[in-house]
Curated annotation (Swiss-Prot):
Keyword Cell membrane among record annotations: yes
Gene that this polypeptide is encoded by: lolD1
Alphabetical UniProt keywords: ATP-binding, Cell inner membrane, Cell membrane, Membrane, Nucleotide-binding, Translocase, Transport
Protein name listed in UniProt: Lipoprotein-releasing system ATP-binding protein LolD 1
Residues that bind ATP: A47, P48, S49, G50, A51, G52, K53, S54
SUPFAM superfamilies: P-loop containing nucleoside triphosphate hydrolases
Matches recorded under Pfam families: ABC_tran (PF00005)
GO molecular function list: ATP binding; ATP hydrolysis activity; transmembrane transporter activity
Gene Ontology biological process: lipoprotein localization to outer membrane; protein localization to outer membrane
UniProt subcellular location: Cell inner membrane
UniProt main location, coarse: membrane
InterPro entries attached to this UniProt entry: AAA+_ATPase (IPR003593), ABC_transporter-like_ATP-bd (IPR003439), ABC_transporter-like_CS (IPR017871), ABC_transpr_LolD-like (IPR015854), MacB-like_ATP-bd (IPR017911), P-loop_NTPase (IPR027417)
Length: 232
């Protein structure tokens, strides 16, 4: 089925400010930051360590509140929502991939991908079918019964990606998803991410130090003086 791009950003950060207390001083990480993520678009977030990449991802993913400003998801302001409402949006609209796969070691690849769907209350038969479909799409159809310890690093990350998109989110947020992988494996994982963006029209924001991979994405942004700036 042909996807139609949304008229509003999937996620929009407007004038976001975030500060932390550091000893007796205040450290300003974001100060008036703006960022729009659109359906079907991949965005690389490249900045030095400590510049605020993880903070930006956490705020965009509703894991952290900004001190000022607003985060819109699908055009809806989130600042006035309850914790339960924010959690519901994270479960349905936002997928996360981390540098460490964070898979549950006692579960198989299939069960790890089924879990987010079961938390939403979907039937086991539905979750099983969708999990198998996603894993097969990512080239893991013959590895679904294996536990994380029985998989390679690249396979573990592809299972983590499958888990992140299990609930068909609007946006995928990834924090250094290839940081622990060798160049060849990192390329395979990156291709899997881009394949999903094209197939599902999910918006994707990846924090990365890998400039070669960043150069293959639709947009590149950085954080400078608390602002999100477009590169190129």
């Amino acid at each position: 089925m042909e996807e139609v791009a949304e008229e509003v950003p999937v996620v929009y950060l407007h004038d976001v400010k975030r500060q932390y207390v550091q000893g007796e001083s205040i450290l300003t990480i974001l100060n008036g930051a703006k960022l729009a993520l659109w359906a079907g678009q991949s965005v690389a977030l490249v900045a030095p360590s400590g510049a605020g990449k993880s903070t930006l991802l956490h705020i965009a993913g509703l894991l952290e509140h900004p001190d000022e400003g607003e985060v819109y998801v699908g055009g809806t302001a989130t600042s006035g929502l309850s914790d339960a409402e924010r959690t519901q949006i994270r479960r349905t609209d936002i997928g996360f991939v981390y540098q460490s796969h964070r898979l549950l070691p006692e579960f198989s690849a299939l069960e790890n991908v089924m879990l987010p769907q079961m938390i939403r209350g979907l039937k086991r038969s539905e979750t099983t079918e969708r999990a198998k479909e996603i894993l097969a799409y990512l080239g893991l159809g013959d590895r679904i019964t294996h536990r994380p310890a029985e998989l390679s690093g690249g396979e573990q990350q592809r299972v983590a990606i499958a888990r992140a998109v299990a609930n068909a989110p609007r946006v995928l947020l990834a924090d250094e998803p290839t940081g622990n992988l060798d160049v060849h494996t990192a390329d395979h994982v990156f291709q899997a991410l881009m394949q999903l963006v094209r197939a599902t029209q999910v918006a994707m924001l990846i924090a990365t130090h890998n400039m070669e991979l960043a150069g293959r994405m639709d947009r590149r942004v950085s954080i400078q003086d608390g602002l999100v700036v477009e590169l190129d």
